[in-house]
């Protein structure tokens, strides 16, 4: 029997790669696994094929040639900023014709209006779980039994931070995970360019402060081909050449938790970098540019470690805003000053979310 997964796969986004790595390990081994993979090719898929063999399908026309026991929308923000119209509904209905059961699994959904066609689409699912409270409230208006299990990467095994530190050793280390907020086209607008220059300056200021405290700085890009540009601009402003961590060289998907746990602190901007910090008990300054990051901190009781940066005004990012320098410094000092205060909340929260994802998968696979 066959299972089909779809998501943002093959886009060189570390967060989505982590979700896929977990999904590959969760689907029961005796099922033939198909993955809708419209972007990239065999080279991009090879690391995942090593985790578990699967058949790639590059178009919905190709996917429709098979029949599936279960069709899963597997994690991530699958409907972040598009207009879901009647054509999208028809496409979703046609895809569903190939499967006995359909499921939304740990997805994030940003409310958009009008939502009539999307509401009809939601009614076609046999099981729905989401990763945040906004998504749960949105879906529950149509499907009352929706589950908020949190992001699916919480289901990865929890690591022993003390053991990771012992294994890697060294002095104080801080990991910096920056998200490039603006495209090259956007930065042609002088107002946007000035906002970007301000952000670069703010990042260099706080990184300089951490260096003065004796921290060794490492950078970890999440969205390949984009985040490196932001990191490069920060490094150029600093006049530094600090290490940039590379997947395949410095870590693999199955060792990223051990690597993250080896750091004493972090400056985290990408959602999954904030998740990794909380999951691995790493006190961090969390720069939140969307609701899911803010909700993660709020649910964990760690809101005081976050500061909002509004990239642009829309349903996904909320209201546009820059960061206050004084508040930014205060949050950094809080993250670095008392690790135990962060860790005392992060560890039990990570344990609860881990169990929530495990319970979610048990419910999901009852459909099989």
PLM regions: where:
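Active-site anion-handling motifs in enzyme catalytic cores
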Residues: 1-368
């Amino acid at each position: 029997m066959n299972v089909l997964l779809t998501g943002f796969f093959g886009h060189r986004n570390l967060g989505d790669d982590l979700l896929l790595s977990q999904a590959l390990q969760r689907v029961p081994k005796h099922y033939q696994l198909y993955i809708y993979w419209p972007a990239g090719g065999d080279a991009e898929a090879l690391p995942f094929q090593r985790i578990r063999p699967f058949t790639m399908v590059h178009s919905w026309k190709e996917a429709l040639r098979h029949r599936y026991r279960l069709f899963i929308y597997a994690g991530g923000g699958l409907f972040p900023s598009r207009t879901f119209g009647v054509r999208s509904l028809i496409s979703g209905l046609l895809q569903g014709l190939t499967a006995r059961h359909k499921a939304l699994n740990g997805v994030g959904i940003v409310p958009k209006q009008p939502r009539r066609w999307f509401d009809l689409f939601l009614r076609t699912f046999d099981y729905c779980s989401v990763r945040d409270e906004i998504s749960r409230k949105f879906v529950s208006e149509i499907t009352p039994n929706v589950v908020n299990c949190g992001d699916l990467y919480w289901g990865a095994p929890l690591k022993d931070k003390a053991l990771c530190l012992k294994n890697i050793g060294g002095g104080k280390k801080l990991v910096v995970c920056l998200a490039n907020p603006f495209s090259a086209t956007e930065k042609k607008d002088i107002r946007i360019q000035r906002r970007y220059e301000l952000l670069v300056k703010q990042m260099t200021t706080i990184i300089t402060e951490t260096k003065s405290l004796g921290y060794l700085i490492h950078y970890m890009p999440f969205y390949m081909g984009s985040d490196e540009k932001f990191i490069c601009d920060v490094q150029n402003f600093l006049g530094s050449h600090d290490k940039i961590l590379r997947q395949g060289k410095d870590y693999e998907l199955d060792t990223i938790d051990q690597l993250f746990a080896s750091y004493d602190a972090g400056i985290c901007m990408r959602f999954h970098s904030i998740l990794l910090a909380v999951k691995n008990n790493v006190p961090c300054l969390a720069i939140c540019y969307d609701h899911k990051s803010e909700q993660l901190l709020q649910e964990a009781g760690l809101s005081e470690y976050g500061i909002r940066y509004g990239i642009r005004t829309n349903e996904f990012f909320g209201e546009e805003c820059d960061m206050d320098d004084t508040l930014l410094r205060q949050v950094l000092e809080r993250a670095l000053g008392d690790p135990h205060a962060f860790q005392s909340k992060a560890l039990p929260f990570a344990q609860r979310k881990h169990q929530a994802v495990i319970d979610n998968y048990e419910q999901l696979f009852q459909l099989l």
